[in-house]
Amino acid sequence: METGGVTEFHEDRYFDPDPTIRKHAREIYDETRALPIVSPHGHVDAAMLAANEPFADPASLIVTPDHYILRLLYSAGVPLESLGVAPLESAAPAAETDPRSIWQRFADNWHLFRATPTRAWIDYELREVFGIKCQLDSATATTVYDAIAERLQSAEFRPRALLRRFNIEVLATTDSASDSLEQHHTLRNANLGTRIIPTFRPDALFRIASPTWGAELKEFAKATNRPIRTYRDFIDAVAQRRAEFKAAGAKATDHAVVVPRTERMSEADAHRLFLAATRGVATDEDQARFESHLLMEMAAQSVEDGLVMQVHAGALRNHNDIVYRRFGPDRGADVPVATEFTRNLRPLLNAYGNDVRFRLIVFTLDESAYSRELAPMAGHYPAMLLGAPWWFHDSIEGMMRFRRETTETAGLENTAGFNDDTRAFCSIPARHDLARRVDANYLGALVGRHVIGMGDAREMGRLMAYDLAKRAYRLTDAGTTGDK
């Protein structure tokens, strides 16, 4: 295997080899590439931006927190400990703490990422963010590490400086219902030029069969500064926190479920399940019923407060029990499951889907549901939008399949634009650039086949890259963080 060469970084990368399509794609992309980034859903840590401290090292920035990287390396037999992932039990063998060793292990296995979106994103990061032109491999690992480490010590590579450099107009974090929002208040007064907003995610409070639910409820009661003894107390406290999140700039809620079942029960039945949870005797079926009821309740509250409701369905989290018990969640062990939406969402959509005050954005890991169920529903109900390709599908071919399978049925403007959904801060511009290239290529093919003209393609390209996300998340009604 050749080592030490210059990274191939063609200007027409990811475009179709057909010269007609490529020409159109390049022209469309040239009009979208420099648009500001709107990141309406993601997992960047607000505390990192508030503190604005230098990143520690290349390994802790790029490798250890990225579950896309962890899953593929683990699949090749690379121990997670060797990548800096600490076991939950102190008695277990310790994780590697030398960032150079972690980076070398990553570089030794860089070949595993060929033709994956992770390779595309990190190639972009190395070249465009850090200015590194040599190919990453075993032989160049130290050189690349040293170059990144040197840059990370400069003021230009602190989080807020990168935020400006990345041209991020809006960045939404995802926050627990008990979050103090202190970091967001700090950022709101920092005059960053970027609007940084929280997202309300109450999932842990809805999982009443979880052994940690009691502790979550206590933390939530502390955050709301009120006793929560009944189901009505609970719902009122949720509404209070939603209002506090909205006052801090939130535009959306987020709800992760395996099955998107929606069914309203009586308040008396909901109270019985809540009391069972407080006694620690709620079953998995109790939790399923409680979650399905609370999705209905969250939709009702969204009608009233205007927060956009996001539902992420079809991911069986922590599929690998051994990895979950040893290392905890978000280690790359989430797996798609076949997911039914037509019947499961019908109660919610019949109750609220015709109300233009309500907005529901649905994401799935079940690709087969795009054309079979979600695009037809998004193409009918005024309140519903189809979310961007997610997790396994925000890839070159995955995003192209999404466009081909949904546009003819839902129409472009019933989709919610792109979101990067990432914890990997430095990958944000890479992910948006890849999406803009894929969308330009999709549109270029439509122009080449005379389905649309170049004027339509330019307008659609801008919608896909920028306008749809702002519209979907109701981001057009306020200025940037720090504006008076």
Model-inferred region functions:
Residues 318-388:
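Active-site-proximal binding-pocket segments
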